[in-house]
């Protein structure tokens, strides 16, 4: 790394909604500072996963150090790229804590969107210097002046220094680099000399183990230091090397000093040993107080993952273990189901997190899997005063011992064009939402604030919102509190046998509609047998919906040409008895498609 001058360091992040051009602007900054040679340049350089490139999203934070010459001085610009999605908001908050400034990228045609709003508020809470960037000014629909006013009126940011740019053509990129140097303050000179470094991410490397990404707040960290983690108060480790992102992770001589961003390796083997937001300090001269803001990341929803072919169980176990190496938020627990066999109960931070894990298992490990419907964590208060937390219908206790149940709620902000207001209000009403306030974002768009049960969000809220707003609506949510709710267990019985994979926890008002839709769906996907198959939805053993798969008919009188009717009656009677016996002892085989179809139900 080049000469160290604290006043020449700039640590910044990029805040943007999906598809507003964050990764493309990062590419242009890397090009303009010659961090990457032209022949090595490719689109979305910092997005290393194929999934990130295809979806146009950032899943893992990717830091990079750039050197920029300005007015005869060389500045070290540390970009700490962050995931934009609400599922990863804790990681975003830690990454922003490692910065002094942020670039707020807004599409000059689309304007401010919900996810960028959520992250701007996180940045404002940390008192970061925010530079608004109006991207995609080359588009015919771009209206930079209108978007400037939107940012000023709704977010309350001064847009005097806002920069209009086009990441596609490169226009305005040099102005962005100048603004980073001029407007974002350098790191403050630390008052302490003891090492304090904020962990904002970690990565598993098969050769060196865990690489811990840090921003050094005070002191320095170098090879040979013995370090410990303050919040988790675990063992101590010897630092085997320190490095920087140039743009690839590269080991360096010397140390990482106050204000700098880099990583260290220390013979750590599990990501779970390294907690995002924790403080690193040395054992010899340890800091007295850790950095503020650390909290454990806990999953907010769960789903079962099962291999379609039971012989793939060990391969699935291996796949999940490997994914967990780079994803400390993913929790895994072995479970078994009568219908689906052996599988895993996995915990996720949200729907996007869940989708990403599923897709990676299928793509990277070439496995066919079935996932049960996602479930949130319910609080069950029993009559004896005890409290249980359950995320699986199989753990639902006997209703006679339940005092009441509580479900998690979330605060939701929805940004939408005005003409879709009534459709969104109907959607939120259907999802048991409570309207808090409605504000004008500009002449044509509104911001709606709602409280909604998390269970209603995880099913299909995003799809329905996109559907009723023709793709123009966007939303973000943050976890709220637990509230009392009439939550019950809905069981599905096939041929009078309960099938655990189809049972779910639902609100009483939605139970009948949900039960009916599952029964109707199963009639279409379970093949006919030689006997009638009843499909029933039941609550507390009381049937609330029923469909019947008709028996395959066999003409047993086909060989009787004319003759006495009693002969035919005898054959029909014999067939009837046989079908009755088959119904008693016959097993209904449920195809895998049935499980997949039921998951598609709202």
Curated annotation (Swiss-Prot):
A cellular-component GO term for this protein: plasma membrane
Sorted UniProt keywords: Cell inner membrane, Cell membrane, GTP-binding, Hydrolase, Membrane, Nucleotide-binding, Protein biosynthesis
Subcellular location: Cell inner membrane
EC code(s) of this entry: 3.6.5.n1
Protein topology in the membrane: Peripheral membrane protein
SUPFAM superfamilies according to UniProt: EF-G C-terminal domain-like, P-loop containing nucleoside triphosphate hydrolases, Translation proteins
A molecular function GO annotation: ribosome binding
Catalytic activity reported: GTP + H2O = GDP + phosphate + H(+)
Annotated GO biological process: positive regulation of translation
Binding site for GTP: 19-24, 135-138
Function: Required for accurate and efficient protein synthesis under certain stress conditions. May act as a fidelity factor of the translation reaction, by catalyzing a one-codon backward translocation of tRNAs on improperly translocated ribosomes. Back-translocation proceeds from a post-translocation (POST) complex to a pre-translocation (PRE) complex, thus giving elongation factor G a second chance to translocate the tRNAs correctly. Binds to ribosomes in a GTP-dependent manner.
Assigned protein family: Belongs to the TRAFAC class translation factor GTPase superfamily. Classic translation factor GTPase family. LepA subfamily.
Protein name: Elongation factor 4
Organism of derivation: Chlamydia abortus (strain DSM 27085 / S26/3) (Chlamydophila abortus)
Gene label: lepA
């Amino acid at each position: 790394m080049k000469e160290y001058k604290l006043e020449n360091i700039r640590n910044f992040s990029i805040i943007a909604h999906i598809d507003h051009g964050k990764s493309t602007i990062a590419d242009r900054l890397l090009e303009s500072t010659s961090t990457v040679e032209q022949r090595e340049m490719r689109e979305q350089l910092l997005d290393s996963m194929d999934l990130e490139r295809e979806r146009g999203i950032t899943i893992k934070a990717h830091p990079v150090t750039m050197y920029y010459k300005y007015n005869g001085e060389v500045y070290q610009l540390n970009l700490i790229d962050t995931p934009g999605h609400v599922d990863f908001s804790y990681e975003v908050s830690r990454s922003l804590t490692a910065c002094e400034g942020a670039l707020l990228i807004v599409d000059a045609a689309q304007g401010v969107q919900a996810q960028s709003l959520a992250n701007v508020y996180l940045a404002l809470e940390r008192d970061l210097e925010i530079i608004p960037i109006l991207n995609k000014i080359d588009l015919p629909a771009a209206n930079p002046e209108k978007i400037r006013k939107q940012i000023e009126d709704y977010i309350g940011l001064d847009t005097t220094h806002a920069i209009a740019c086009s990441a596609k053509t490169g226009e305005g990129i040099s102005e962005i680099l100048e603004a980073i140097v001029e407007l974002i303050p350098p790191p403050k000179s630390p008052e302490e000399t003891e090492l304090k470094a904020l962990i904002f991410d970690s990565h598993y490397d098969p050769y060196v183990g865990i690489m811990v990404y840090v921003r050094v707040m005070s002191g320095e960290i170098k090879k040979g230091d013995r370090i410990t983690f303050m919040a988790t108060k675990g063992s101590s480790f010897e630092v085997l090397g320190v490095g920087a992102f140039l743009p690839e992770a590269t080991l360096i001589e010397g140390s990482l000093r106050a204000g700098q961003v880099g990583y260290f390796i220390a013979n750590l083997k599990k990501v779970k040993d390294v907690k995002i937001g924790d403080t690193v300090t040395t054992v010899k001269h340890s800091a007295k107080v850790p950095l503020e803001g650390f909290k454990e990341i806990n999953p907010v929803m769960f789903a079962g993952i099962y291999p379609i072919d039971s012989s793939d169980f060990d391969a699935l176990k291996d796949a999940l273990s490997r994914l967990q190496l780079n994803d400390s938020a993913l929790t895994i627990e072995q479970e078994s189901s009568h219908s689906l066999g052996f599988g895993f109960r996995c915990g996720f931070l949200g729907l996007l997190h869940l989708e990403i894990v599923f897709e990676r298992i299928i793509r990277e490990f070439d496995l066919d899997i079935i996932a049960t419907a996602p479930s949130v964590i319910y609080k069950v208060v029993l009559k004896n005063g005890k409290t249980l937390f359950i995320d699986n219908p199989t753990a639902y206790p006997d209703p006679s011992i339940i005092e009441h149940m509580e479900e998690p709620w979330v605060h939701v902000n929805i940004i939408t064009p005005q003409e879709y207001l009534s459709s969104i209000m109907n959607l939120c009403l259907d999802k048991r939402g409570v309207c808090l306030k409605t504000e004008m974002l500009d002449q044509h768009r509104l911001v709606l604030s709602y409280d909604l049960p998390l269970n209603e969000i995880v099913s299909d809220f995003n799809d329905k919102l996109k559907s009723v707003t023709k793709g123009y609506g966007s939303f973000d949510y943050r976890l709220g509190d637990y509230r009392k709710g009439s939550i019950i267990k809905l069981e599905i019985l096939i041929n009078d046998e309960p099938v655990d994979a189809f049972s779910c926890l639902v609100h009483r008002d939605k139970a009948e509609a949900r039960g009916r839709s599952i029964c109707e769906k199963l009639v279409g996907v379970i093949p006919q047998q030689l006997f009638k198959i009843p499909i029933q939805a039941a609550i507390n053993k009381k049937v609330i919906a029923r469909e019947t798969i008709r028996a395959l008919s066999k003409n047993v009188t086909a060989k009787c040409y004319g003759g006495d009717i009693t002969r035919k009656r005898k054959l029909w009677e014999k067939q009837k008895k046989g079908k009755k016996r088959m119904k008693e002892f016959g097993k209904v085989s449920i195809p895998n498609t049935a499980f997949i179809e039921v998951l598609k139900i709202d």
